[in-house]
């Protein structure tokens, strides 16, 4: 019986491979732009003609000589790697040698390029990636790649693509993600011969993000850059413990900005945005109980890791990777986020403006600024007072002074944050005698109280006896009401939040200066001092520069008197 298994024709193999790499306008832009960045370009111009199925990418990179141009679109041809060992030494964005050849399978491709001190060349490629037309041409150093008649040989592919508007939205998102990983690059994007959008270069990703989210203000974001050692792994061929990893982190301060969706929880490794559910969940967990309900953080994590820690060869688009020692990196990310969200003297003077409160000062001065929330660094566990308690307003707010201005701290939610973190670190139940009697609990309420550790049993008809309770509730007169509140559902952390809220000092309670100072000191040492466990902001900041502008302290005396 003849075999039914046959080798596929070469053109079918190439078509299958091309479909894995190039599936949309965004994929074309991604592959060409990554080649530009690998060539050292710091200025990239993208032209799009979606109705004509044409894309052009021009850059000021190193360019190519004629020999490289003639080989550039050949199958499995690349300048990035030479052997299998190089798969663990990848420093470039591309390495597979598939993109340009795939494009010649699906479209008409032309490349014009010039290396410095060489003449420029124009090369047109055929379906198999071979150069069919070569001629000298005038061009500045760099490369221009034009892809025309995209998917002309695959009519079904064109029909299956989303609408033009959706494809252009995907292109914009792709360019923004790449720009975020390479903030020093200048971008200009044209659509149908009209400028569509530009991205100006920035020193860091944190300075670039406001171009994508214009509603943000610079002080809404906190950026940190850390050098951390690579983990020891004897299974790897090389062990670069001596070479540190760079961890760059940009977070939206939880009292300043958050999102309806987790669309800005982003992870990049070695210059490429990736999908890493594990690291994304680590980020979300680090912001737990710092944001309002059903809100998500703004966070961009970029790791520059030794290449031997990563396996890129898992997905043609290289968005999915295998990262060695994942738990180690998760721990480092958690520590970095915690460090970023804290408050210390190092940056207590820095603050940002809030629209809500700045209106108060605008009544007297159009440019007045009322500021909110300083940026952060490591907390200090010593007794140095970064904030000095000065007074209490309405038995609710603590006026605190520091070298750069003053803060207004809401005493109840500041104390709530302190107590909540203490409960998280030490959830302690103590026996009570006589027991607390509750009336008419449902089976679900009984099960909930038992779930969080309370000892409860039947005391009579429709009566239940609670024989222990959280230590913080021991001195309260409303213990029964507090336990009833705990019985209405939620996990242990929900119960801890409820206990902290019940136990915190109430607004309207007078406090002495030593009591206020003690609360300020305890609050500054918390892990997440910016918001209460419900996500509400804890303090307002009014810095010295705002006060000076408001009271016009920089005026010359003679001029202020009309002299």
Swiss-Prot record:
It comes from the Bacteria. It comes from Trichormus variabilis (strain ATCC 29413 / PCC 7937) (Anabaena variabilis). One of its GO terms (biological process) is mismatch repair. The gene is mutL. GO terms for cellular component: mismatch repair complex. The keyword DNA repair applies. Keywords: DNA damage, DNA repair. This is DNA mismatch repair protein MutL. The keyword DNA repair applies. Belongs to the DNA mismatch repair MutL/HexB family. PANTHER family: DNA MISMATCH REPAIR PROTEIN MLH, PMS, MUTL, DNA MISMATCH REPAIR PROTEIN MLH1. NCBIfam families: mutl, PRK00095.2-1. This protein is involved in the repair of mismatches in DNA. It is required for dam-dependent methyl-directed DNA mismatch repair. May act as a 'molecular matchmaker', a protein that promotes the formation of a stable complex between two or more DNA-binding proteins in an ATP-dependent manner without itself being part of a final effector complex. InterPro entries: DNA_mismatch_repair_CS (IPR014762), DNA_mismatch_repair_MutL (IPR020667), DNA_mismatch_S5_2-like (IPR013507), HATPase_C_sf (IPR036890), MutL/Mlh/PMS (IPR002099), MutL/Mlh/Pms-like (IPR038973), MutL_C (IPR014790), MutL_C_dimsub (IPR042120). GO terms for molecular function: ATP binding; ATP hydrolysis activity; ATP-dependent DNA damage sensor activity; mismatched DNA binding.
């Amino acid at each position: 019986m003849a075999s039914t298994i046959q080798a596929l024709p070469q053109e079918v193999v190439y078509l299958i491979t091309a479909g894995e790499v190039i599936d949309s306008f965004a994929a074309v832009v991604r592959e060409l732009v990554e080649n530009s960045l690998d060539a050292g370009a710091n200025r990239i111009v993208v032209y799009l003609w979606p109705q004509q199925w044409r894309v052009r990418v021009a850059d000021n990179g190193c360019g190519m000589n004629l020999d490289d141009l003639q080989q550039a679109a050949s199958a499995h041809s690349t300048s990035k790697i030479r052997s299998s060992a190089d798969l663990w030494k990848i420093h470039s964005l591309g390495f597979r040698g598939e993109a340009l050849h795939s494009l010649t399978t699906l479209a008409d491709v032309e490349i014009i390029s010039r290396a410095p001190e060489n003449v420029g060349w124009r090369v047109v490629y055929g379906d198999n990636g071979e150069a069919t037309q070569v001629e000298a041409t005038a061009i500045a150093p760099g490369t221009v790649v034009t892809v025309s008649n995209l998917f002309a040989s695959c009519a079904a592919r064109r029909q299956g693509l989303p609408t033009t508007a959706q494809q252009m939205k995907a292109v914009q998102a792709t360019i923004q993600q790449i720009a975020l990983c390479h903030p020093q690059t200048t971008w200009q994007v044209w659509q149908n011969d009209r400028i569509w959008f530009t991205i100006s270069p920035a020193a860091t990703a944190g300075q670039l993000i406001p171009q994508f989210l214009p509603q943000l203000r610079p002080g809404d974001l906190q950026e940190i850059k850390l050098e951390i050692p690579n983990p020891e792994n004897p299974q790897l061929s090389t062990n670069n413990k001596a070479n540190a990893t760079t961890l760059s982190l940009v977070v939206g301060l939880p009292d300043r900005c958050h999102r309806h969706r987790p669309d800005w929880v982003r992870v990049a490794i070695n210059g490429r945005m990736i999908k890493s559910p594990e690291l994304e969940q680590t980020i979300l967990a680090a912001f737990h109980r710092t944001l309002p309900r059903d809100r998500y953080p703004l966070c961009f994590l970029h790791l520059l890791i030794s290449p031997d820690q990563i396996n890129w060869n898992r997905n043609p688009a290289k968005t999915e990777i295998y990262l060695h020692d994942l738990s180690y990196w998760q721990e480092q990310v958690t520590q970095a986020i915690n460090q970023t969200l804290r408050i210390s003297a190092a940056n207590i003077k820095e603050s940002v403006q809030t629209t809500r409160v700045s209106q108060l000062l605008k009544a007297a001065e159009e440019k007045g600024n009322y500021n909110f929330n300083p940026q952060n660094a490591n907390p200090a566990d010593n007794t140095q007072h970064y904030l000095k308690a000065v007074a209490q307003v309405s038995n609710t707010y603590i006026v605190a002074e520091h070298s750069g201005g003053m803060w207004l701290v809401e005493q109840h939610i500041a104390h709530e944050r302190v107590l909540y973190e203490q409960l998280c670190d030490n959830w302690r139940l103590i026996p009570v005698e006589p027991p607390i009697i509750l009336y008419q609990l449902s089976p679900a309420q009984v099960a909930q109280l038992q779930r969080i550790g309370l000892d409860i049993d039947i005391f009579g008809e429709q009566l239940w006896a609670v024989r222990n309770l959280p230590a913080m509730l021991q001195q309260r007169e409303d213990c029964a009401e507090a336990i009833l509140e705990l019985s209405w559902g939620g996990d242990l952390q929900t119960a801890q939040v409820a206990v902290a809220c019940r136990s915190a000092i109430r607004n309207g309670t007078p406090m002495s200066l030593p009591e206020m100072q003690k609360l300020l000191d305890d609050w500054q040492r918390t892990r997440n001092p910016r918001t209460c466990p419900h996500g509400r902001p804890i303090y307002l900041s009014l810095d010295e520069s705002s006060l000076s502008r408001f009271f016009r302290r920089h005026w010359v005396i003679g001029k202020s008197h009309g002299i």
